[in-house]
Amino acid sequence: MEDDFDTQNQFPEEEPEEMDMDLPDNDEADSAPYLKIGEEMEIGKSGLKKKLVKECEKWDTPENGDEVEVHYTGTLLDGTKFDSSRDRGTPFKFTLGQGHVIKGWDLGIKTMKKGENAIFTIPPELAYGETGSPPTIPPNATLQFDVELIAWRSVKDICGDGGVSKKIIVEGEKWEKPKDLDEVYVKYEARLEDGTIVGKSDGVEFTVKEGHFCPALSKAVKTMKRGEKVLLTVKPQYGFGEFGRPASDGLQAAIPPNATLQIDLELVSWKTVVEVTDDRKVIKKILKEGEGYERPNEGAIVKLKLIGKLQDGTTVFVKKGHEEDEEPFEFKIDEEQVIEGLEKAVMGMKKGEVALITISPEYAFGSSESKQELAVIPPNSTVYYEVELVSFIKEKESWDMNTQERIEAAGKKKEEGNVLFKAGKYARASKRYERGVKYIEYDSTFDEEEKKKSKDLKIACNLNDAACKLKLKDYKEAAKLSTKVLEMDSRNVKAMYRRAHAYLETADLDLAELDIKKALEIDPDNKEVKIEYKKLKEKVKEYNKKDAKFYSNMLSKMLEPHKGTQKEAQAMSIDTKA
């Protein structure tokens, strides 16, 4: 029944570590409004609203320049969730009033107290405006954020313990700041408190995480913008500690034990390094920033210039789009026309961006030898691509479609999923079904006939996706998808069958039995369900045997001490008589 298909994702949301909207300098809200729980009021004169969910007894609120730490969930007005730090399990940190986030956040969060929870309704003018933030936020969208202010601290105290103090001498540009994997280029001069120079560079490049000179440099550059110049006061624990550092061949003076340092530091530039996959096996280093904010989505047609090299850095195995009369290399995303790692990396690029992509074998050519046009790639090879994204044409988003187009797009994704499923490509098929559902997930604007078609497509896509999840051994997700179907069609035997199958695999035998019995009530002659019922009975017998053995062993162990005590008592009795 898993293969018995009804024949009637968009790119995952990026984690907005810092939301990219420039802010005006003027502030509309400088004080915290007094609210009772459940009350809502407007902040400023631009339509920003705040509703208090949980109050706090403290009175102080953060100021511009403070680093705040929040948990949040962002939704559209129709309830569609587009982002959540709570789902990721990691609070979001940013510097208040510096343009790191949309203006509605900067204005709203400065009215909050530590521990407070509030819901902000943010009009498009204070959010992402006329352009929106594709693919998750449509143009002219009013947003709602459920925000909890966890903590904040002054960015002047970088580490929170007084170990590194930062004084900004020259403000940097824009709002971006380097992260752990980025390669920064800095200039610095380090001095003892008496002015003795103990370290200097007119230009050095290093990875933030790996550091350079002393731990304070890595801590500091993560708080700096491009072009920013600062004076750091560095305590020993972030300098050279209790042992100091000896002089080096007359080139650098010694650093005494427990010395405090003064460091002039300039962040000249950096190359952004991105972990494309969660397992860090596809890494992208941006050599040249791209234009705008849009990136290719699944189904997009992209054009590239690329050079592929082996790990030795000299062996070129592919080169496309670089000759004067040569057209860029073209492929369609999610059609297996290139290796998985390259495809994933390109989906995170902007038009005109140039990047160096490092791809481990799992996302490249695997454990087999692969003959490419210019060289043979040995088994288990890590490969490197230098890629320029020349242009791309995105697949149409759902909000750019009318209702009929959305239904047709959903049907097309379902058919594509069916083809992939029959070819045994279950993960890719699952993505097609998920994308199909997204087109028609919200159908409030559909007429009655369109709603019926939409419902049938949602049932088919979720049902077939559940079959994919069973094949991929993702049994919990298979059960969830089957439940979605049953919420729309409570007598759907296939959904009961697939959920029962999932429950059997997760050892939820009581739940599996309920689904199987219900399915047989509706369709007593269904062979597949009968086979599943047989499997259930066998599993129940197996578990009963295990339980019987377990309790038998446990009972034996409980009785053993009593037997031993009895024997000892008998022995003592004999000894006494003797």
Swiss-Prot record:
N-acetylmethionine: modified positions? 1
Query: Is Nucleus given among the entry's keywords?
Result: yes
Q: Where are the TPR repeats?
A: 410-443, 459-492, 493-526
Q: Where in the cell is it found?
A: Cytoplasm; Nucleus
Ranges for region Calmodulin-binding:
539-555
Question: Taxonomically, what lineage is the organism?
Answer: Eukaryota, Viridiplantae, Streptophyta, Embryophyta, Tracheophyta
Note the PROSITE patterns from the entry.
Answer: FKBP_PPIASE, TPR, TPR_REGION
Going by the record, the broad EC class of this enzyme is isomerase
**EC number per UniProt:** 5.2.1.8
Family in the record? Belongs to the FKBP-type PPIase family.
- Function of the protein: PPIases accelerate the folding of proteins. It catalyzes the cis-trans isomerization of proline imidic peptide bonds in oligopeptides. Co-chaperone that negatively modulates thermotolerance by interacting with FKBP62 and decreasing the HSFA2-mediated accumulation of chaperones of the small-HSPs family. Plays a positive role in tolerance to intracellular acid stress by maintaining the pH homeostasis. May be a part of transcription regulation pathways upon pathogen infection.
Q: Which residues form the PPIase FKBP-type domain?
A: 65-153, 181-271, 299-393
Tell what triggers its expression.
By heat shock and by intracellular acid stress. Up-regulated by HSFA2 and upon pathogen infection.
Bias class Acidic residues marks the residues at 1-30
InterPro entries hit by this protein: FKBP4/5/8-like, PPIase_dom_sf, PPIase_FKBP_dom, TPR-like_helical_dom_sf, TPR_rpt
Describe its assembly.
Answer: This PPIase probably binds calmodulin. Forms heterodimers with FKBP62/ROF1.
According to the UniProt record, one GO cellular component term is: plant-type vacuole
Query: Catalyses which reaction?
Result: [protein]-peptidylproline (omega=180) = [protein]-peptidylproline (omega=0)
Organs and tissues of expression: Expressed in the whole plant.
Record keywords, A-Z: Acetylation, Calmodulin-binding, Chaperone, Cytoplasm, Isomerase, Nucleus, Repeat, TPR repeat
Protein name listed in UniProt: Peptidyl-prolyl cis-trans isomerase FKBP65
GO MF annotation terms = calmodulin binding; peptidyl-prolyl cis-trans isomerase activity
Residue ranges of the region described as Disordered: 1-32
When the coding gene is removed by deletion, what phenotypic consequences does the entry describe?
A: Acid sensitivity and increased susceptibility to P.syringae infection.
